[in-house]
Amino acid sequence: MTDFTPDAVLDATGLNCPEPVMMLHQHVRNLAAGGLLKVIATDPSTRRDIPKFCNFLGHELLQQQEDAGTFLYWIRKKAD
């Protein structure tokens, strides 16, 4: 478990590829530079897609974890 306090939460529970990453892209756009976003997902492909999204766009994936089929991600938006 983590002590991160997110500025926003994206609940993509029940959504399948490509919806979680599409929603993530919109949520990151609305987040202030340096803001922290928590993503909750159930699609196993997010284990691959979200780290690639962060790497490609320069955002920091602070932590990811899995708990009983639920995937959690904490993403810090890059500075502008």
From Swiss-Prot:
Q: Where is the active site?
A: C17 (cysteine persulfide intermediate)
One of this protein's GO BP terms? tRNA wobble position uridine thiolation
Query: Which Pfam families does its entry note?
Result: TusA
Name the UniProt key words of this record, in alphabetical order.
Answer: Cytoplasm
Return the Gene3D superfamilies for the record: TusA-like domain
| CDD domains noted in UniProt | SirA (cd03423)
CC per GO annotation? cytoplasm
Q: Where in the cell is it found?
A: Cytoplasm
S-S bridge residues: none
Please provide, alphabetically and separated by semicolons, the GO molecular function terms listed in this UniProt record: sulfur carrier activity
Q: Which domain of life is it from?
A: Bacteria
Checking HAMAP family in the record gives:
Thiourid_synth_A
State the function annotated in the UniProt record: Sulfur carrier protein which probably makes part of a sulfur-relay system.
Family assignment from sequence similarity: Belongs to the sulfur carrier protein TusA family.
**Any idea what this protein is called?**
Sulfur carrier protein TusA
- The species this protein belongs to is Pseudomonas putida (strain GB-1)
